[in-house]
Swiss-Prot record:
Pfam families: Ubie_methyltran. This is Ubiquinone/menaquinone biosynthesis C-methyltransferase UbiE. SUPFAM superfamilies: S-adenosyl-L-methionine-dependent methyltransferases. Pathway: Quinol/quinone metabolism; menaquinone biosynthesis; menaquinol from 1,4-dihydroxy-2-naphthoate: step 2/2; Cofactor biosynthesis; ubiquinone biosynthesis. It comes from Dinoroseobacter shibae (strain DSM 16493 / NCIMB 14021 / DFL 12).
């Protein structure tokens, strides 16, 4: 059981109590769950699909592997994994039940539900034994975690020796001019778009603020190494709008 704490953390550009952040994040995704996939397409111009395919290309799923997809939401990563890996199994864990409900409905439509398990849970306290999974993925979720080092430590714990971590997350553009243009788009277009599509501007204001606060590629790679992972590498996607980070438990 997690003890109550008066420590603070960030929720976008706001400062909040650590104990409150998970509930705030849960509220964001409860509000947008029904339109989550549509908004991803609109915000990225469909690029999130290309990025997720690039994630699978680098990951190269193998038959009979066991995947844990954390913050797995509506199942995009797990579905891609299972379609490439015969006889593989996947557990999708998410803090927000409404996201998992949407994912289950998609899994039934794609006839993948028999190879999937869905679980409400916290990335910082995974309900699994040590050395339980071959692959751990988290896509556009790690920046929402209250204590990222704790989540990375849990990822390391539940992976088997030889297991692989793969993180897809929005990142920082190395080119200052492109970063400025991207910020203008993010802060001036995405929240109003969220208001029109989901009737929820605030959740998408949080989204763009959380992206801007997330560590750059090298800093996040260092955090992964500190958690114990070896052979940590990253690849920029679309000039650094997003990045893939990979690490191994050896």
């Amino acid at each position: 059981m997690t003890e109550s704490t008066d420590k603070t953390t960030h929720f976008g550009y706001q400062t909040v109590r650590e104990d409150d952040k998970a509930g705030l994040v849960q509220g964001v995704f409860t509000n947008v769950a029904s339109k989550y996939d549509i908004m991803n397409d609109l915000m990225s111009g469909g690029l999130h699909r290309v990025w997720k395919d690039a994630m699978m290309d680098w990951l190269a799923p193998r038959a009979a592997q066991r995947l844990l997809d954390v913050a797995g939401g509506t199942g995009d990563i797990a579905f891609r994994f299972l379609k490439r890996a015969p006889e593989a199994e996947a557990v999708v864990l998410d803090l927000t039940e409404s996201m998992l409900i949407a994912g289950r409905q998609r899994a039934e439509a794609e006839a993948l539900d028999a190879r999937l398990n869905w679980l409400v849970g916290d990335a910082m306290a995974l309900p699994f034994a040590d050395n339980s999974f071959d692959v751990y993925t988290i896509s556009f979720g790690i920046r929402n975690v209250t204590r990222i080092p704790d989540a990375l430590a849990e990822a390391y714990r539940v992976l088997r020796p030889g297991g692989r971590l793969m993180v897809l997350e929005f990142s920082q553009l190395p080119n200052p001019g492109l970063q400025k243009a991207y910020d203008l788009y993010s802060f001036n277009v995405i929240p109003p778009m969220g208001k029109v599509v989901t009737n929820d501007r605030d959740s998408y204001q949080y989204l763009v603020e959380s992206i801007r606060r997330f560590p750059d590629q090298e800093s996040f790679a260092s955090m992964i190494r500190t958690a114990g992972f070896d052979q940590v590498k990253y690849r920029n996607l679309t000039f650094g709008v997003a990045a893939l980070h990979s690490g191994w438990k050896l």
